Amino acid sequence: MRLSSQRSVADSFSSMPLETLGAGTDLNLQDGSRVALIGGGPAGAFFTYFLLKMAEEIDLELEVDIFEPRFFSRCGPSGCNHCGGIVSESLVQILATEGINLPSEVVQRGIESYVVHMDVGSVAIQSPAKESRIAALYRGNGPREGGDLQWDSFDAYLQGMAVEKGARVRHNLVTGVDWIDGKPRLTEADGTASTYDLVTVSAGVNSNFIKLLKDSPSGIEPPKTTRTYICEFKVGRDGIQEIMGNAMHVFLLSIPRLEFAAPIPKG
């Protein structure tokens, strides 16, 4: 979980010495330019989708590689992207205006309200539209012992949209970055090295790539974090409906070292 913002990636790279980029380096993408995304979660998938969509509109051909070692179609920890899995109403509306409607196989339950529990009492906050437009979902393909659940991964769905636009997913870990003739070069765990015209960092705070950037000319500092515990409990559809209903419960209690707790009903 990110706690405090640091110097942005854009600020960091804009302050890089010109000799690192190379004299006369053209920063405009051209036909055949190569773009790499470090991280294939929602940030990387959305960036890729809209980049290729805009490139298509101006008849610009790009080669885009998404580096993501995880397979979001897998159950359990190997497919989990370390998130409780909740999409806000505002994001659902923004996606809809772009023609992106999350299918029922991805949205497991529509959330109608938030219930906030504090030491002084509890209060329910209803959705302004009074509709179930807050989405509960799985970032991966669900719990390891989840059984035969017919749900699709949110991250895999978005990644699939990017692939349909022409991106290529490389399930490899990037272990090194340097500059060759003013362009970033990425080295993978198997030793493969590739040079790109643009590298976009869409990795999470747990990514080792963020630490690699600290020693690069960009000098990006990893953000401060706090520990987050994510787990799943099999309650059953009837049990969830009886105990929680279609509400996400948030606990803001005076317990040492606890920022908050938030059970999310799914299924």
Map each language-model feature to its residues.
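Short beta-strand to alpha-helix junction loop
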Residues: 83-89, 131-160, 208
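Predominantly flavin-linked oxidoreductase catalytic cores and closely associated redox partners
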Residues: 50-53, 152, 157-267
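Glycine-rich FAD pyrophosphate-binding loop
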Residues: 52-81
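Beta1/beta-strand and adjacent pyrophosphate-binding region of the FAD-binding site
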Residues: 24-43, 65-67
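Glycine/serine-rich phosphate-binding loop and adjoining beta1-alpha1 elements at the start
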Residues: 1-19
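Charged, glycine/proline-rich intrinsically disordered loops and linkers
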Residues: 84, 99, 123-145, 218-219, ...
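Conserved Rossmann-like nucleotide-cofactor binding loop
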Residues: 43, 72, 206
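N-terminal FAD cofactor-binding segment of flavoenzymes
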Residues: 71-123
